[in-house]
Curated annotation (Swiss-Prot):
Subunit organization: Homodimer.
Keyword annotations of the record: Amino-acid biosynthesis, Aromatic amino acid biosynthesis, NADP, Oxidoreductase
Function: Involved in the biosynthesis of the chorismate, which leads to the biosynthesis of aromatic amino acids. Catalyzes the reversible NADPH linked reduction of 3-dehydroshikimate (DHSA) to yield shikimate (SA).
Uppermost EC category: oxidoreductase
UniProt organism field: Saccharolobus islandicus (strain Y.N.15.51 / Yellowstone #2) (Sulfolobus islandicus)
Protein family according to the UniProt entry: Belongs to the shikimate dehydrogenase family.
Protein name: Shikimate dehydrogenase (NADP(+))
């Protein structure tokens, strides 16, 4: 953490609602110190009324911001521009000087490439239909996933995501649950890791979890139980943060160093 704030200190932060649990300030303030950057990262926990009242002011004074639930889509109308990926996905989680980016998308692409490479021939089941689900669905589609099935509590959001994916030339549909028998990739973008049935995990080649507290959720435990490859929520959180710092500073601390720091501080378990 920066020991002294002065005239030249740059402001960064996270915008969201009910986000006291977040690790983002620990990650970024550690990175700023490690990289020797005169900056501070704060949390802006805003209800909808506060968000609408102060978002323009935050965009004026902050050098860069991250955005989480429930504002990844809403924030776009306040920005001057968005990059190709966030425009297509219609969700932003990283802002730099009023420009929007989606580093959730970049993180999923990076991590899936490391785990299994090309997704050709895989059927992907995405649980949830919010901003994280959009990023995951687009990333997996761009890696070659043959079909995307959206599993969500309500059909309204699921239909919107399916239409968006199909409009961009991908093969998407709504499913009540996974019913394939092989070459499955399962993504949980909801706050509830138990939403994915165990029999679905058993048939998977790769499991992707967005929840990171605890790191070993029920979904990750089951993936380990059946010797399934997995990407946990901490990996996603850290990699998207690293990608955000590359946008802000064109440099970053390594994923491994950040994760080591979080465990050493007992901030994750």
């Amino acid at each position: 953490m920066l020991e002294e704030i002065n005239y030249d200190t740059k402001l960064f932060g996270l915008i969201g609602k009910n986000i006291k649990y977040t690790l983002s300030p620990y990650i970024h303030n550690f990175s700023f110190t490690t990289l020797g950057i005169n900056a501070v990262y704060l949390v802006f926990d805003l209800d909808e009324m506060k968000f609408n009242r102060i978002i323009n002011g935050l965009l004026e004074i902050a050098e860069g911001l991250n955005v989480t639930i429930p504002y990844k889509e809403e924030v776009m109308k306040y920005l001057d521009n968005t990059d190709t990926y966030s425009t297509r996905i219609q969700a932003v989680n990283t802002i730099y000087k009023k420009g929007g980016y989606n580093t959730d998308y970049l993180a999923i692409k990076n991590l899936v490439r490391k785990k299994i490479g090309n997704m050709s021939g895989y059927e992907c089941y995405v649980y949830g239909a919010g901003g994280a689900a959009k990023a995951a669905a687009f990333a997996l589609s761009e890696l070659g996933c043959s079909s995307i099935s959206i599993v969500n509590r309500t059909n309204l959001r699921a239909n919107e995501l399916v239409e968006l994916l199909n409009k961009n030339g991908y093969n998407a549909s709504i499913k009540e649950n996974c019913n394939s028998t092989s070459n499955i990739v399962v993504v949980n973008s909801t706050p509830n890791p138990s939403v994915v049935p165990e029999n679905c995990i058993q048939k998977s080649e790769l499991v992707i979890e967005f929840v990171y507290k605890p790191v070993e959720t029920e979904l990750i435990k089951n993936a380990k139980k059946y010797s399934i490859k997995y990407i946990d929520g901490l990996e996603i959180l850290v990699n998207q943060a690293v990608e955000a710092e590359k946008i802000w500073f064109n440099k970053s601390v390594s994923d491994e160093k950040i994760i080591e720091y979080l465990y050493a501080r007992k901030l994750v378990w």
